Every structure is written in C-alpha cells, then in structure tokens.
From Swiss-Prot:
This is Large ribosomal subunit protein uL6m. InterPro entries: Ribosomal_uL6-like, Ribosomal_uL6-like_a/b-dom_sf, Ribosomal_uL6_a/b-dom, Ribosomal_uL6_bac-type, Ribosomal_uL6_CS. PANTHER family: 60S/50S RIBOSOMAL PROTEIN L6/L9, RIBOSOMAL PROTEIN L6-RELATED. GO terms for biological process: translation. Signal peptide: none annotated. Pfam families: Ribosomal_L6 (PF00347). The keyword Mitochondrion applies. Keywords: Mitochondrion, Ribonucleoprotein, Ribosomal protein. GO terms for cellular component: mitochondrion; ribonucleoprotein complex; ribosome. It is found in: Mitochondrion. It comes from Marchantia polymorpha (Common liverwort). The gene is RPL6.
Length: 101
C-alpha cells in the first residue's frame, strides 16, 4: 500500500508520549491522565510513531486520514495558555496572555 496522504501530529507537554503496538493497529497515548488512552486504528489508515512526541498518520483516503488525526487530536486539544496538548505539525496556536498583577 502506497500512502498518498500524510498527517503529522505533534505532542507537546512534559511526560506526554505516544506509541503503537508491533502491527500498528493500536495507538497508545499517555497524556497526563490517570490511565493510558488506547485508540483502535482504522484498517485504511497506518500510524507510525517517529518519535515519542511525533505521530504520522498515512493512507490512501484523505478523508479517513484526517478523520483519524482529528480523533487523536480531540483526546487532548492544545491548551490556550501554555500550548500543551496534541496539535498538527504546521498549526499555529495563539496563546492567551495570563493574569496581570
């Protein structure tokens, strides 16, 4: 299977990690919750963890690749004050200013 479409997700935060099993059918996410999040990967999408904080979703169908990437991102969307969470690689997060004293 040749992959035409790619979607890179970046995990930002101390202790936040991603990994896959040997077949690449399950994505494990450690996002600061008390439990590990397991996501079943759809058969038409392949998922690779290039680094513990970089996820690559590939596939032939653009809609399915971006749909799975959106599901992964919805597990921990970027925070507006510190920017921690899961974001697309080329996404720009506009941070809010904190309280002024």
């Amino acid at each position: 299977m040749e992959a035409k479409f790619f979607c890179f997700l970046e995990i930002i935060g101390v202790g936040y990690k991603a990994s896959t099993n040997a077949q690449g059918s399950i994505l494990y996410l450690k996002l600061g919750f008390s439990h590990e999040i397991r996501l079943q990967v759809t058969p038409s999408v392949r998922v690779f963890c290039l680094k513990p904080n970089l996820i690559c979703c590939t596939g032939m169908d653009h809609q399915k690749v971006t749909q799975f990437a959106a599901i992964v991102k919805s597990c921990k969307p970027p925070e507006v004050y510190k920017g921690k969470g899961i974001q697309y690689r080329n996404e720009i997060i506009h941070k809010k200013q904190g309280k002024k004293k």
